[in-house]
Amino acid sequence: MNAHEALAEIAGKMFGDNAKKVMMVLASNVEVSDEDLAKDLKMDPPELRKLLNDLFEARLVKYRRARDENIGWYKYYWRITDEPIQQILSDRKRLTLSILEKVLSLEENSETYVCPKCGTRYTVDEAENNNYTCEVCGEVLEPFDNTHRVEKLKRAIELLGNWDPSPKQQASRAIPHA
């Protein structure tokens, strides 16, 4: 699998099949305008632009803006990022670990309640403010045992912490799933 195919796979996992299709079209071109991409992929232009912006925020694509001399509006030309994939994956790993660790800390250090009927979760303060009844269905709230969630988060942190995005590691194993 080459770098462009790997980026397309990542985009697909993050944003769905349309993102993968966009990346594959970009991989076979130097630059493509969002208008041409929308036509090629038969996508709604606003939907495509949102997807391109999501891919840009994830650092998977780049763009160039040029003024159309005839109408004075800007046209955007998109291409696959030239940033090394290992750097993108390392940064994403670091960000994801940070988020998972914050969620773990919240789960370990806070008491929560759950509605046995609809499954809505509440913090202690929210439960107290609602007199321990569910805002959605009126059922009496029960303490929530989050032991399973805590263990799952710890396992995900361990797996991701041990994952190495370097090319030699990727050849031998896939991204771990928690």
UniProtKB/Swiss-Prot annotation:
GO terms for molecular function: DNA binding. GO terms for biological process: regulation of DNA-templated transcription; transcription initiation at RNA polymerase II promoter. InterPro entries: TF_E_archaea, TFE, TFIIE/TFIIEa_HTH, TFIIE_asu, TFIIEa/SarR/Rpc3_HTH_dom, WH-like_DNA-bd_sf, WH_DNA-bd_sf, Znf_TFIIB. Keywords: DNA-binding, Transcription, Transcription regulation. Residues 3-86 form the HTH TFE/IIEalpha-type domain. The keyword Transcription applies. Transcription factor that plays a role in the activation of archaeal genes transcribed by RNA polymerase. Facilitates transcription initiation by enhancing TATA-box recognition by TATA-box-binding protein (Tbp), and transcription factor B (Tfb) and RNA polymerase recruitment. Not absolutely required for transcription in vitro, but particularly important in cases where Tbp or Tfb function is not optimal. It dynamically alters the nucleic acid-binding properties of RNA polymerases by stabilizing the initiation complex and destabilizing elongation complexes. The winged helix domain is involved in binding to DNA in the preinitiation complex. Belongs to the TFE family. PANTHER family: GENERAL TRANSCRIPTION FACTOR IIE SUBUNIT 1, TRANSCRIPTION INITIATION FACTOR IIE, ALPHA SUBUNIT. Monomer. Interaction with RNA polymerase subunits RpoF and RpoE is necessary for Tfe stimulatory transcription activity. Able to interact with Tbp and RNA polymerase in the absence of DNA promoter. Interacts both with the preinitiation and elongation complexes. HAMAP family: TFE_arch. This is Transcription factor E. It comes from Thermofilum pendens (strain DSM 2475 / Hrk 5).
